[in-house]
Amino acid sequence: MKKFTTFLLGFMFAVTLAQAPANYYDGTAGLTGATLKTKLSQIITAGAIDKGYDGLYTGYPTTDRDHYYENDGSVLDMYSENPTGTDPYNFQHGVKKCGNYSNEGDCYNREHIVPQSFFNSASPMVSDIHFIRPTDGKVNGIRNNYPHSVVATATQTTLNGSELGESTTTGYTGPVFEPIDEFKGDIARM
């Protein structure tokens, strides 16, 4: 009985919190089909705000702050984070942003998980924070526009163990970039 009561209270609490903001769906009552779809599209679109490419850096302290591994508030960089030990280097938000680098740890920039060349650097994708992560500039350059996949033999290995090399994927023989196992799922979902 105690488990059931706990479950019921938890369920009721979750349902209460999962409500849309007041008046969010105004104008949808009685609509169906294409008319409803169009109205929902208008509602969703009205809530999206493109902060621009430089605006990504203002979002990263919220979206990519390390609250899990070292829990130190540094930039959570999937290409330099070492989940099982000491990071080779850390970046602080707003410090050491870059365009120029020669070594890992010099600076961090913005990594398009889906390369800009796939969508001709068009808006709004070019500044979509949902798939642009802050990463080490040097490793971002190593990754280049190569797809993410499993590496057969590494030609280059980064300080956290990510690799560049030939693909094991049937039908693709070019170079690929393989992040460490800890972040493969995150990257696959972007």
Where would I find each of the regions flagged by the language model?
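Bacterial Sec-dependent N-terminal signal peptides
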Residues: M1-P21
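A broad, low-specificity signal marking well-ordered, structured residues that form hydrophobic/aromatic
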Residues: F4, T16, L76, Y108, ...
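N-terminal module-boundary/linker segments of secreted carbohydrate-active enzymes
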Residues: A18-P88
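Short alpha-helical segments and helix-capping/turn motifs at coil-helix boundaries
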Residues: L56-D64, Q92-G94, S117-S121, P175-E178
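Short, His- and charge-rich active-site/binding loops that engage polyanionic ligands
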Residues: P83-C107
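Domain-level detector of nuclease and nuclease-like folds
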Residues: C98-M190
